[in-house]
């Protein structure tokens, strides 16, 4: 991933020896000041990655097995699961290689490790970009289904959805390759941050607009049935809570990583920023957690998908 040179983890592990580190402790930065560092045990990181891997594989298999789920909406959900699967898998692979190098179980030249590091970084970066894009695509799809309900099936066709999916994957791989090749340039890191903020604003605007429409719809129904205002307020509160959870999880899981990239550009040598840089693995762990949560929000809430998943699991036994 595009981080500071000292944090290129695979290359650093060639000449490193494993050291015991606490999960939470005070570490000294370059100026000798004390700062909070959260160390994520490799076992915990790999376990979270495995949970995410299994979850998202199940989503992909369930959607692929059920032809009723071969719709544009589930196409985006399936691709989101595939992106999250690659995010988890690439980070697990990197961690496993690091552990093997540190244990001496894997012997490799620096040039080979450099190439492997670049490949893993491209996979990780492209899957992160595609994951953000598919979250935005799902928001746009839901927006069209609400505000253009009568024209939805003519606007969002499976053919167009597949074109969007192909464009997202191609663009993600292309731009991630450029990002990794020029990760030392401030403009590259800032463009990633701007892209994240654009996705955040897009999702917030669309979902807030959808919430407002839902409240208006509930108010109209309440007036038709001559109900009191609390019924309308209940819908608004429930929708606001759902929106807060959805956007809150997105910002909490992705925000720290992009804050990290921003600080690399703004204050690479500042003591406070150096303390934040020490928690890079924590920020990656939060992204893995997002990959675990995404299926719960976007996939497993579907009864049709849950039924298909149950059949798949029963057949596997």
From Swiss-Prot:
Annotated compartments: Cell membrane
GO biological process entries: adenylate cyclase-activating G protein-coupled receptor signaling pathway
A single Gene Ontology CC term: plasma membrane
Keywords, alphabetical: Cell membrane, G-protein coupled receptor, Glycoprotein, Lipoprotein, Membrane, Palmitate, Receptor, Transducer, Transmembrane, Transmembrane helix
Segments on the Cytoplasmic face: 64-72, 141-163, 212-240, 301-317
Glycosylated sites: 29
A GO term, aspect molecular function: melanocyte-stimulating hormone receptor activity
Lipid sites, type S-palmitoyl cysteine: 315
Homology family: Belongs to the G-protein coupled receptor 1 family.
Subunit structure: Interacts with MGRN1, but does not undergo MGRN1-mediated ubiquitination; this interaction competes with GNAS-binding and thus inhibits agonist-induced cAMP production. Interacts with OPN3; the interaction results in a decrease in MC1R-mediated cAMP signaling and ultimately a decrease in melanin production in melanocytes.
PANTHER family membership: G-PROTEIN COUPLED RECEPTOR
Protein name, as recorded: Melanocyte-stimulating hormone receptor
Originating organism: Trachypithecus cristatus (Silvered leaf-monkey)
């Amino acid at each position: 991933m595009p981080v500071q040179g000292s944090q290129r983890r695979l290359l650093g592990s060639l000449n490193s020896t494993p050291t015991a580190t606490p999960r939470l402790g005070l570490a000294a930065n370059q100026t000798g000041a004390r700062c909070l560092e959260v160390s994520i045990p490799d076992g915990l990181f790999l376990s979270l990655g495995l949970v995410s891997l299994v979850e998202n594989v199940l989503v992909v298999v369930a959607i692929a097995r059920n032809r009723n789920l071969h719709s544009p909406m589930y196409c985006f959900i399936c691709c989101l699961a595939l992106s999250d699967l690659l995010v988890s898998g690439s980070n697990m692979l990197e961690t496993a290689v690091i552990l093997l190098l540190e244990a001496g179980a894997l012997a490799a030249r620096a040039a080979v490790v450099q190439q492997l590091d670049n490949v893993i970084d491209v996979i990780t970066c492209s899957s992160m970009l595609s994951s953000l894009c598919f979250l935005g695509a799902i928001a746009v799809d839901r927006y069209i289904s609400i505000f253009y309900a009568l024209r939805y099936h003519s606007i969002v066709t499976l053919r167009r959805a597949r074109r969007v999916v192909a464009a997202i994957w191609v663009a993600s791989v292309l731009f991630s390759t450029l990002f990794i090749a020029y990760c030392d340039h401030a403009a590259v890191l800032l463009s990633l941050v701007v892209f994240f903020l654009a996705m955040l604003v897009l999702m917030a605007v669309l979902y807030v607009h959808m919430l407002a429409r839902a409240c208006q719809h509930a108010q109209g129904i309440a007036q038709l049935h001559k109900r009191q205002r609390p019924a309308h307020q209940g819908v608004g509160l429930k929708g606001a809570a759902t929106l807060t959870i959805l956007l809150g999880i997105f910002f909490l899981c992705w925000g720290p990583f992009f804050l990290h990239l921003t600080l690399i550009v703004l204050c690479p040598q500042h003591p406070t920023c150096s303390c934040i840089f020490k928690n890079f693995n924590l920020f990656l762990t939060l992204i893995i957690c997002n990959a675990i949560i995404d299926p719960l929000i976007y996939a497993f809430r579907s009864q049709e998908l849950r039924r298909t998943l149950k059949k798949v699991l029963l057949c596997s036994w």
